[in-house]
Amino acid sequence: MRSGGWVLILAAAVTLVGTVWNLAPLFDPNRVRPRGDGREARSYDFDLTTTLVPKEKIVSCGMVADALPPLDDPKVITLAELSGLETVGRGKYLVPKDKVIGVVINGVSRAYPLRVLVWHEVVNDTVSGVPIVVTYNPLSEGIAVFDRRVAGQALTFGVSGLLYQSNLLMYDHAGSHAAESLWSQLQARAIAGPAASEARTLDVVPFALARWEDWQAAWPETTILGPVNGDGTKYGQDVYGTYFNSDDLRFPVDPLPPAGSLGRKTRVFVSGTPGAWTVTPLGVQNDESRFEVVGPSGTTPVPGFYAFWFAWYATHADDPGTTETTESR
């Protein structure tokens, strides 16, 4: 399928889910005009006067800003509530093999199912008094968790509708378009707007990527990101399966990893600091029998990033540490 068709299918799916959930009633005269036209980056009204990445490489994902609605102060449920939810629902909200992003802050554990994040990408949450943002970008398979506190202020983030190297660009809700900045998920920094001019960065929060059954066993007191409404079965749709099973890319990426490097969509975990990254391949794409967890035994959070190799390479091509890889586990 050509790129345009894939984008239209994803956009249609998002629109359908949004309609069902009544997130933005179509005929509400007070509804704010959607931000962006789904084609030109400049139509999204972000300040691109000065950018820390090549401006021409910032592109639209084909949808308006926040078409994938971020979750702010989301509903959180306990294991007991999860059991009740599954009893009354038409299906299970979580099954043992589902992948979750797990965090533990001051002894408080929480799980964020990927099947939920695929429809939101950004979750602004607070765990044990610490404001965090949990991010997942399926196009790059990018996963990162950050402390939302920047320069003494707890920011909230949205989904800009723009990409850099086929990776999520978030934006902060700063009150006005002129005050907002774009933030790169895999670079953990502002790349456009006032925060970029001030060289603002995000602090990484340790996370684990694990199967739900393993996370629950390790953290029996864990809470879980709950469904937006109802029983959560709307999250069962999968629009990325074909994409995950091929080497095709849907948006511009330059540079690509050199020949003889890891496969484009080899999943990697990256730890360290700029100039001294450790890049660990995690196995064959979409091969559930070789699913690798992040963190010791998959249940102890560690600081770092998870992504497809092509996305990490492209967003860190100028960093000498990018080429240092270890053997696949």
Protein language model regions, located:
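Mid-to-C-terminal functional-domain signal that highlights helix-capping/loop sites
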Residues: 2-329
